[in-house]
Amino acid sequence: LVVAPLRPVTRADQLPLYVVLHGRGSNPAAMERLTSLAAVTGPAVLVYPAGYEDSWNAGGCCGYAHADGINDVAFIHAVVQGVLAEYPAVDPQRAFAFGFSNGGRMTYRLACDLPGTFAGIAAVEAVPVVDCRRLHPLDVEIIAQRRDPLLAIASGAPRKSMDGYVEPTVQSAVDQWRRLDGCAPPATTSHRGTATLRTWRCRAGTRLQYTLYSGGGHLWPHAHGTRPAADGIILPFVRSAPRPAD
């Protein structure tokens, strides 16, 4: 599923590319409905790929794609290259990957295994299940909700498991990516309604932002009352992201 600008565009437009990955058991059309990205991105090309048997092989565990050894890293790389060939107006230095749940896990893997492809990622309600030892600098947004029944939030919280895989806590995932991205303390803390945002400055001018919502569940946060939409957190964050270092 590709959503492109309706008006004619040229190479001079230098549009961003957003690759948006659905969760396990979902699909591209459902992911488009789940988010409001297409309505709020402005001029951009959005791509909603379809995972194998509605899942992604993010490494570590879970789903048909993992069980059958599907090479989703190569698949997403081919998707990006195909879009760049078909839409010359897309700026290859402004490609980003967003994902929810299993799709969020996959964005972590893409950051590790496709260095230089994406300028930034956003993982919503997801922790990494891949052992990433080295990372080319890129912007990273991690979004979680305190009452997510499938994720443990604080470092000392009882860890959750899925399909026999014991997952890291969200805080330990944040700490891991702070190390990988070379982020320096202290964090800058800000608040947007029910969300607390902590932002670190990292290597090569990149940033890591951890957004934690009070309440919530295992879902893509939508705007309601004082709760900001996840889309409104992610897009301002990634728009100024530099391309990963070579």
Regions found by a protein language model. Name each.
Residues 1-7, 13-96, 105-109, 113, ...:
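Serine-hydrolase catalytic machinery in alpha/beta-hydrolase-like enzymes
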Residues 33-34, 152-179, 189-199:
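Short alpha-helix in the alpha/beta-hydrolase fold that links the catalytic acid
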Residues 8-9, 24-26, 51-54, 147-149, ...:
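Acidic glycine-/aspartate-rich tracts in secreted/extracellular proteins
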Residues 139-143, 168, 178-246:
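C-terminal catalytic histidine-bearing segment of alpha/beta-hydrolase fold enzymes
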Residues 143-148, 154-155, 161-162, 212-216:
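Conserved strand-to-loop "acid loop" that flanks and positions the catalytic carboxylate
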Residues 51, 122-129, 145-149:
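Active-site nucleophile loop of the alpha/beta-hydrolase fold
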Residues 93-139:
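Primarily recognizes the serine-hydrolase "nucleophile elbow" in alpha/beta-hydrolase
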